[in-house]
C-alpha cells in the first residue's frame, strides 16, 4: 500500500502537487475487455451536470486524464490505486458535465505513526489521502466543501485526530494555509530517502481553543445567543446543499458556485432585529414555505450556523467594497447587489459559518408542538438554550459536534 498521500490542489489554474519522489513518467493502464465494458456502462449512466457522490475506486476509470498528474508524480500510483480498488475502497468524486473534477480519499488508521519525526502514538485517526481539487474558475471554493466532508467524516467516525502530509513548497502555500485556517498544526515531519521532507499537519478533534475557525466544525453553546433565521426556498438550497429536502430537485438547483461549495455563507436581508447579531451567535436555519403545501409541513429547520460578523451599508466605503465583500459567498448576482446598494440603506449582511446539517429536518408543526415555538414573527427570533437544545435533539444532530 502507498504510505504517502497524493494531494493536489489546483488553485486558480495552477497545478500544485504533493506527492513523494516526483517523476514525469506516465503510466496509463492497458484497457482490458472487462474494463472497456465497465467504462461503457459507467459512461452511459445518466449523471447530472453537477454531481458530488461517493464511488468505489473500481467504478472510476483509472485511464481518466484527471489522474495523469498523479501518475506523473508517483510512479506506483496505478499499483496503489488497483490495490484500493480490489479492497473495495471508496472516494468522494465531483463531476462537472460528466467530467471528473475533484477526488477525495479518506482512510481510518489506528496504529502508531512510526515513520514520522517525532513518532506519533497510536490513536484513531482520519488520514487525508488523495485530495485533488481542480479549481479552474477563480470564484469556486470546492476545496472548502471537501474540507467540510473531511470534518463530517471525522465526526462520524469519532476519531481523535485528522492528519495530512504535504511538501512545504511555495506552490503549496495556499493549501497549507487552508488546512491551518481550520485548526491543523505542523507537529511532525516525514523524511524521505532522497533527503526531502514533508510537513505532517494534524488537527486534534478532542481539544477546542474557543476560536471560531480553529474549532470548526464544533458548535460551542456556552456564552452565545441562539436564534432562528428564515431563508426563502429559492436561496436556501444554493447556500446549504447538504441540507436539501427530499422534495427538491438537487441538481437543477445546485450550481458550481462559491456560495454552494463554501463553508462561509453570506446572507443579505431586511428583517428586523438581525443587525443585533454578534460574532459567535448561533443560528438555526429555517427554510420557509414553498407554497406547495401547508407551512406546518413545508417550513423546516435544516442547519446550524455560527455568525462570523454582521455589517450594514455604513460599514462599506463604497459600492465596490460592498460587492467585493458579498459577491463571493452570497446567492445574489453582482447586478442585484449593486442595485441594492444604490436603492436600499437598511439591509443587513450576515457572514456565517456552516457547521452542521440536521439529520432529520424539523417541520413547523413539530417546532410548535414539541418545542413550544409560536413567535409573532417567524422571520427572525431568539431561542432559549432549552429550545435550541431541543431543536438539535429533534434534528438528530450528532452530539460530537456540540461543545458545552
How would you name each of these model-derived features?
Residues 2-40:
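Long, low-complexity intrinsically disordered regions enriched in small/polar
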Residues 36-46, 153, 159-160, 164, ...:
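Contiguous surface segments at macromolecular interaction interfaces
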Residues 43-87, 93, 235-257:
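Short amphipathic alpha-helix that is part of the acyltransferase structural core
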Residues 89-94, 103, 130, 349:
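Short hydrophobic/aromatic beta-strand element in the GNAT-like acyltransferase core
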Residues 97-130:
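Conserved acyl-donor/pantetheine-binding loop and adjacent beta-alpha core of acyl/acetyltransferases
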Residues 133, 139-155:
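Conserved acetyl-CoA-binding loop-helix of GNAT-fold acetyltransferases
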Residues 273-292:
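Short coil-to-beta transition motif at edge beta-strands of beta-rich domains
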Residues 294-306:
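Short coil-to-beta-strand transition motifs
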Amino acid at each position: 500500500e502507498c504510505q504517502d498521500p497524493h494531494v493536489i490542489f489546483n488553485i486558480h489554474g495552477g497545478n500544485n502537487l504533493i506527492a513523494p519522489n516526483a517523476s514525469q513518467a506516465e503510466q496509463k493502464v492497458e484497457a482490458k475487455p472487462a474494463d472497456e465494458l465497465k467504462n461503457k456502462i459507467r459512461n452511459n449512466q445518466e449523471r447530472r451536470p453537477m454531481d458530488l457522490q461517493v464511488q468505489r475506486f473500481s467504478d472510476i476509470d483509472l485511464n481518466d486524464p484527471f489522474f495523469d498528474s498523479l501518475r506523473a508524480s508517483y510512479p506506483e500510483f496505478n499499483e496503489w490505486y488497483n490495490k484500493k480498488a480490489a479492497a473495495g475502497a471508496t472516494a468522494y468524486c465531483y463531476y462537472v458535465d460528466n467530467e471528473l473534477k475533484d477526488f477525495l480519499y479518506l482512510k481510518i488508521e489506528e496504529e502508531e505513526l512510526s515513520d514520522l519525526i517525532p513518532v506519533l502514538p497510536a490513536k484513531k485517526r482520519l488520514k487525508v489521502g488523495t485530495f485533488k481539487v481542480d479549481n479552474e474558475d477563480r470564484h469556486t471554493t470546492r476545496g472548502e466543501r471537501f474540507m467540510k466532508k473531511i470534518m463530517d467524516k471525522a465526526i462520524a467516525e469519532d476519531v481523535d485526530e485528522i492528519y495530512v502530509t504535504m511538501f512545504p513548497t511555495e506552490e503549496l502555500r495556499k493549501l497549507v494555509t487552508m488546512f491551518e485556517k481550520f485548526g491543523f498544526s505542523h507537529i511532525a515531519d516525514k523524511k524521505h530517502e532522497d533527503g526531502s521532507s514533508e510537513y505532517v499537519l494534524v488537527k486534534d478533534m478532542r481539544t477546542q481553543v474557543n476560536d471560531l475557525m480553529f474549532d470548526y466544525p464544533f458548535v460551542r453553546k456556552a456564552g452565545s445567543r441562539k436564534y432562528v433565521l428564515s431563508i426563502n426556498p429559492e436561496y436556501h438550497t444554493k447556500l446549504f446543499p447538504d441540507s436539501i429536502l427530499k422534495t427538491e430537485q438537487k441538481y437543477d438547483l445546485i450550481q458550481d458556485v462559491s456560495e454552494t461549495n463554501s463553508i462561509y455563507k453570506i446572507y443579505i436581508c431586511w428583517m428586523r432585529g438581525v443587525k443585533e447579531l454578534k460574532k459567535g451567535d448561533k443560528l438555526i436555519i429555517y427554510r420557509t414555505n414553498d407554497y406547495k403545501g401547508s407551512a406546518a409541513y413545508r417550513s423546516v429547520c435544516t442547519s446550524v450556523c455560527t455568525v462570523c460578523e454582521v455589517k450594514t451599508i455604513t460599514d462599506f466605503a463604497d459600492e465596490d467594497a460592498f460587492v467585493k465583500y458579498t459577491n463571493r459567498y452570497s446567492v445574489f448576482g453582482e447586478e442585484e447587489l449593486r442595485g441594492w446598494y444604490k436603492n436600499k440603506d437598511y439591509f443587513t449582511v450576515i457572514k456565517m459559518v456552516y457547521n452542521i446539517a440536521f439529520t432529520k429536518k424539523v417541520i413547523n408543526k413539530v417546532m410548535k408542538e414539541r418545542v413550544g415555538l409560536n413567535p409573532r414573527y417567524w422571520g427572525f427570533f431568539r431561542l432559549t438554550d432549552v429550545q435550541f437544545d431541543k431543536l438539535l435533539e429533534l434534528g438528530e444532530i450528532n452530539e460530537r459536534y456540540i461543545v458545552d
